[in-house]
Every structure is written in structure tokens, then in C-alpha cells.
């Protein structure tokens, strides 16, 4: 009997829980939006920065779209204002919180950011005034365990603010670090960093970032695999240094010298030891692409080094900004350049079915010829001739319209990408991609950009409404999708910068009477139609397959010119390629004469070649859009002196 009563009472006890669940599910969602701008509320003006958005759902289940509107363009950019919408599809359980990371890059802080969450007929929005958060100086970010702040003397030596950041707050996008001058690690384990965070740090370093790793007594933290990815040394343990005369001599003052301090015993793996003691590196500097990594073996957070008078001078050197690099000449597509590309026969054949159009023309001319023949031979009456002529034009017009607009292999659009890879040290190459999407139909289009890009600018060829010029950005795994509408026979231009690996070894040795060029293609791609330009002369090198090497010598025939005006200049438009579209892109895109890049003087040597079957950085998954991708790799080598050369 007791078993029967318990079995009967069980559903009755479950009724309150069922009614509570139904009431929560039926309740309307109440969403609250909280944000954190930049690094603890600060970002550097004119650079991308991270934005953390937290959605707190105080009601039932909510499903919708989180959107951040950013304004781009303006007079400073030379283009009209247009909005960029960063979107995420969100599912919020009842009574829950979720955080989302964005990297945004507004061109002006005068317009507020607008955050919107909309779904199921409800809409919540919030505006952020960016004028309260920006810093004109670069930021210095310190990452330590438990946000412990060591005594870093950066006041007079560094103009920007010092921000202490937790490891979990590091962004997972390399673009978010562009406003950071240096990233300092002290007594911090990196094993909890995600793969995306580690990849973001490496991408930021290779594009010009600076990382400072300060040693401490907790040497085991510096032996972890995650930290070893950035360290130029291998830490073995601790060592007590009785004195560091080289460090005292370089940075010390008239005070007492350093004595009896602890540091890490390490072995140099890469880079160079700026300071060492007894064969052990004390201060190490190494290059990572365009960036640098510094390692200091001694502990600056504990005495006696923390009270040392030479510490400000040491940090002045370590935190000094990287020297400005002279920008390499890079072409940018505009309406003039793209109009020239659009009018070339090689590009016209990409969106016009020439063979079908030729057959259609033959059909029309054949029909017209038959009508004329019937009129000349008096085989048809005037009424029948007129009827045949009208029917011929009607059939040709209607059939041509239906065939070429809906069938006939006429694409809805053509995506053309021209990428210029600028080789640099460490096997890295800066990629600048000029992208054009040409439309034959009025519809919305989408392009995918590989993650890791550092800058993107979407140009609209003519002034339009906000809806026509808007761009929607959505992250999709390892790529970012950019969507925008286009009218019939309209187009849109994109400029994208990124950093990638392309290990091509190039050495140019000047022996006085001759130059020796050594090339070693260590990349996974073949180079075709390679050229070498030096002192106003061009030399064809042919193809360089992956894994192969090439050595050429060029004999000097004359002395250097006496003045700058006497230096020979080569018109790069005289160089010919087997591929006609290669030639068009080379003339109008990579080295357009209208932008002052068509002539090459004797200021340096130039090597370039086409990358065969390059991995696309921009692509589309739309089957109705044809995609063409072309990549040119080049290296510019500074060269002093002059004289004509002859290939030896």
C-alpha cells in the first residue's frame, strides 16, 4: 500500500517543477547589454581594438542577432561614410549570461558605436561614446599572475598608459593588438591560452609587435611549451650572479653596482645575446617577422634589481618604439584602375560568353541573310518578308534575353583578386590584396576573407544610401564573411592587408665588379615568369620550382652615374608575360604608371615572380560567381652604387 501511495504522489510532486519550467519558458526575454571597450576601457586612437559584449538574459529563452554598427570612411579616408555591421547569431538560455568578442576599427570617434540585440519581435540597443575611451599614445600591456604589478619604471620612459591584464582577457584576434606598443610577460603561465589566442600573439609579432619577457625566480613557468614558443632561449634553472659588470657598465649610474642577484640559467636558441655573463645570456633580442622579442634573465620584481638606479635606462631601450620602416610602393585600386581592367578583352571574356554570343550573332546574320535573299529573288511577298523580319527580330531578341540572362553560362558576378606579397626577413611576407566584385545582376553578394587579416577597407564607387553602401561582417570558423548588395553592372572594391609565411631565401652579394644573386625557394609554391631588375636593367630568370635554388651573376660594365638624374630608369611596362591577364594586372594593378610606380630607378634591386596556384585569401562559396585569383611575389633590396650590368 505504501508503494502505491508513493507511486501516486510522485507525479503530484513533479507538478510544481513542470509549472515553473513552463512559466520560465513562457516569460518574455529581458536582455541587458554590458560592454568593455578596449583594454580595461582604453584603446589607441586610429587602430583596431577589442570590444567585449556581455548579454544578460533575465527572462525566458532568447534567440536573435547581436549587431555592432561601426562607421567607416569619411573625409580623412577620401571616401563617403558607410556603415559596417558586425553580426553574431546568439541563443541565450533562460536566466543566463554570455560574452562575445569583437574587433572593431572605426575611422572616427565622433560617431557612437551602436549595439543591438534583436529577436522574436523584441529589440534592445545601446550606444557607446568612444570619446571617453581613446588614448593618443600607444598602450603598454602587462600580463602577470594574479595581476601582480612589479615595479616597472615606465613613467618618464614611456608616454602611453600601462595596463595590467589578466591572461583570459587577451584577445584572440591579432588585429586587436595593433594599438599596443609592447606586451610584457612576468611570472605568467601561458598553458591556459587557447589556440586562437596563441595564434593571435604570433600573428601580431610577425606584423611588427614587440614582446618583452621578464625572467623571475619561478623558472618552471618559463619551461612550459606555450611560453617556449616565444622565448629565444631554453631555461634550465636558476643561477646566482655575484655581479653583472656589463649590465652595470651599459645602464648603471654612479651608485652602488649590482651584486648577489638571482637570475635564470638559460641556453641561447635563436637571436643574439646583447648581454651575457660567463656564457649565459642575460639580455636576448630576436626577430619574429617584422616584430621583436626581448628576454631578460634577471628578476626585476625583486631586490636588488627592483631598486637599481639603472633600471629606467634599461626599460627605455627595451620599450622604445620600433623604427619606422619606409613604406614599400604599393598600388591601390580605384575607379580609374578598375575601369581599365574592366575594359580589357581578357577580363571581358570572364563574364561574357564569347562563343555563345558569336553563335547567336551567326544565327541572326544567317536569318537576316535568308530574308534579304528571299526579297532579292522575289520568292516572298512583301507582307511575308515583313512578317519574317519581325519574327526573326522577336525570336532573336527574346531567345537572346532568356539565354544570356538566365542560362548561357553567364555568371551573376565575377570576383577578381590581385595579391602582392612583399617579402621580408624571417620568411614572412606582407600581403596586400586588391579585390573587385563585379555584378551582372541586382542581388546581395558575399565574400570570405581568411582570418589573420590586419586591415580591410571597402570602397563604394559612387555615393549611395546607407543600405546600398552597408557591409555586414560575420565570423564563420576560420574566415570572415563580408556581405553587401550590388546593382546590375555595379561593382565594389576591397583592400585587404594580411601577413603570411612565404620562405624564399634571397641573397645579393656585391663583389665590386659583379653582383651575385642567390635564390632558394623554400616555400610550398612554384614561382613562374620571374624577373630581376637592377640599375635600370631587367633580366628574365624563368621558373623557380618549390625546393629549388638559382644562382646568377651579373657583371658591372660602367661606373656609377655622377648625379641622380643620370641614373637609368626602367619602364616596367615593357616587361612581357605569357599570360595576357598577368600583363594587364602588372601594368594597371601592381605597378601602375598613373600612381608613379611604372618606372624603376637604380635605388635598389627588384625581384618578382608569379605564384602558381596560390592559396586564395579571398574567395566565394557562391556557385553563380566566377572567381579569379592572381598573386605576385616581390622583394625590394636596397642597393648603393651604380653601373650597368651584364649577365654572366
Which residue stretches match the model-derived regions?
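Aromatic-Pro/Gly-enriched surface loop or interdomain linker
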Residues: 47-50, 108-189, 216-217, 233, ...
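Short acidic, flexible loop segments centered on an aromatic residue
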Residues: 61-78, 529-538
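Intrinsically disordered, low-complexity Pro/Gly/Ser/Thr-rich segments with frequent PxxP/GP/PP motifs
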Residues: 72-108, 537-564
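A glycine-rich, often tryptophan-bearing local segment used as a flexible ligand/cofactor-contacting loop or short
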Residues: 154-157, 175, 185-278, 314
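A glycine-centered loop/beta-turn motif at secondary-structure junctions
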Residues: 179-180, 210-211, 264-370
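Accessory, solvent-exposed terminal regions and/or long lumenal/extracellular loops of proteins
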Residues: 341-350, 437-648
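Internal/C-terminal transmembrane anchor helices
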Residues: 382-406
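Alpha-helical transmembrane signal-anchor/signal-peptide segments
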Residues: 386, 404-425
Amino acid at each position: 500500500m505504501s508503494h502505491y501511495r508513493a507511486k501516486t504522489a510522485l507525479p503530484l510532486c513533479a507538478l510544481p517543477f513542470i509549472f515553473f519550467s513552463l512559466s520560465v519558458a513562457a516569460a518574455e526575454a529581458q536582455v541587458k547589454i554590458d560592454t568593455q571597450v578596449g583594454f580595461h576601457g582604453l584603446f589607441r586612437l586610429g587602430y583596431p581594438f577589442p570590444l567585449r559584449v556581455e548579454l544578460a538574459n533575465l527572462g525566458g529563452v532568447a534567440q536573435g542577432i547581436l549587431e555592432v554598427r561601426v562607421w567607416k570612411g569619411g573625409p580623412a579616408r577620401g571616401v563617403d561614410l558607410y556603415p559596417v555591421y558586425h553580426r553574431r547569431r546568439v541563443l541565450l538560455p533562460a536566466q543566463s549570461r554570455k560574452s562575445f568578442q569583437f574587433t572593431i576599427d572605426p575611422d572616427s570617434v565622433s560617431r557612437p558605436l551602436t549595439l543591438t540585440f534583436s529577436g522574436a519581435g523584441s529589440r534592445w540597443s545601446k550606444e557607446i561614446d568612444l570619446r571617453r575611451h581613446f588614448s593618443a599614445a600607444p598602450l603598454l600591456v602587462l600580463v602577470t599572475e594574479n595581476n601582480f604589478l612589479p615595479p616597472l619604471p615606465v613613467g618618464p620612459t614611456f608616454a602611453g598608459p600601462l595596463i595590467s591584464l589578466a591572461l583570459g582577457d587577451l584577445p584572440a584576434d591579432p588585429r586587436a593588438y595593433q594599438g599596443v606598443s609592447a606586451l610584457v610577460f612576468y611570472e605568467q603561465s601561458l598553458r591556459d591560452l587557447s589556440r586562437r589566442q596563441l595564434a593571435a600573439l604570433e600573428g601580431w609579432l610577425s606584423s611588427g609587435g614587440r614582446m618583452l619577457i621578464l625572467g623571475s625566480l619561478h623558472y618552471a613557468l618559463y619551461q612550459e611549451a606555450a611560453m617556449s614558443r616565444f622565448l629565444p632561449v631554453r631555461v634550465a634553472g636558476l643561477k646566482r650572479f655575484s655581479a653583472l659588470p656589463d649590465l652595470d657598465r651599459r645602464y648603471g649610474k654612479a651608485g652602488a653596482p649590482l651584486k648577489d642577484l638571482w637570475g635564470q640559467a638559460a641556453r641561447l636558441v635563436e637571436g643574439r645575446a646583447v648581454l651575457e655573463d660567463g656564457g649565459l645570456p642575460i639580455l636576448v633580442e630576436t626577430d619574429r617577422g617584422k616584430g621583436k622579442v626581448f628576454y631578460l634573465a634577471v628578476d626585476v620584481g625583486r631586490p636588488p634589481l627592483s631598486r637599481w638606479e639603472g633600471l629606467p635606462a634599461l626599460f627605455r631601450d627595451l620599450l622604445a618604439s620600433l623604427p619606422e620602416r619606409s613604406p614599400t610602393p604599393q598600388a591601390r585600386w580605384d575607379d580609374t584602375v578598375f575601369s581599365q581592367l574592366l575594359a580589357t578583352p581578357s577580363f571581358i571574356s570572364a563574364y561574357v560568353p564569347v562563343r555563345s554570343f558569336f553563335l547567336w550573332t551567326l544565327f541572326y546574320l544567317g536569318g537576316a541573310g535568308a530574308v534579304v535573299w528571299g526579297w532579292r529573288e522575289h520568292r516572298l511577298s512583301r507582307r511575308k518578308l515583313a512578317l519574317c523580319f519581325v519574327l526573326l527580330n522577336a525570336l532573336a531578341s527574346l531567345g537572346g534575353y532568356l539565354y544570356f540572362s538566365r542560362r548561357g553560362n553567364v555568371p551573376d558576378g565575377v570576383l577578381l583578386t590581385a595579391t602582392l606579397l612583399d617579402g621580408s626577413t624571417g620568411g614572412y611576407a606582407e600581403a596586400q590584396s586588391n579585390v573587385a566584385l563585379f555584378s551582372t545582376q541586382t542581388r546581395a553578394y558575399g565574400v570570405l576573407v581568411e582570418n589573420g587579416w590586419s586591415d580591410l577597407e571597402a570602397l563604394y564607387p559612387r555615393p549611395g544610401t546607407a543600405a546600398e553602401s552597408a557591409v555586414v561582417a560575420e565570423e564563420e570558423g576560420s574566415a570572415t564573411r563580408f556581405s553587401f548588395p550590388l546593382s546590375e553592372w555595379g561593382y565594389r572594391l576591397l583592400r585587404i592587408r594580411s601577413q603570411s609565411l612565404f620562405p624564399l631565401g634571397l641573397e645579393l652579394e656585391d663583389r665590386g665588379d659583379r653582383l651575385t644573386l642567390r635564390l632558394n625557394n623554400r616555400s610550398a609554391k612554384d614561382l613562374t615568369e620571374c624577373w630581376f631588375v637592377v640599375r635600370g636593367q631587367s633580366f628574365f630568370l624563368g621558373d623557380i620550382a618549390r625546393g629549388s635554388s638559382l644562382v646568377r651573376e651579373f657583371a658591372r660594365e660602367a661606373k656609377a652615374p655622377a648625379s641622380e638624374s643620370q641614373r637609368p630608369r626602367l619602364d616596367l611596362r615593357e616587361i612581357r608575360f605569357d599570360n595576357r591577364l598577368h600583363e594587364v594586372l602588372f601594368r594597371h594593378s601592381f605597378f601602375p604608371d598613373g600612381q608613379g610606380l611604372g618606372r624603376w630607378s637604380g635605388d635598389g634591386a627588384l625581384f618578382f615572380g608569379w605564384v602558381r596556384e596560390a592559396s586564395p585569401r579571398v574567395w566565394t562559396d557562391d556557385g553563380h560567381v566566377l572567381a579569379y585569383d592572381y598573386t605576385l611575389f616581390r622583394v625590394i633590396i636596397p642597393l648603393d652604387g651604380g653601373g650597368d650590368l651584364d649577365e654572366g
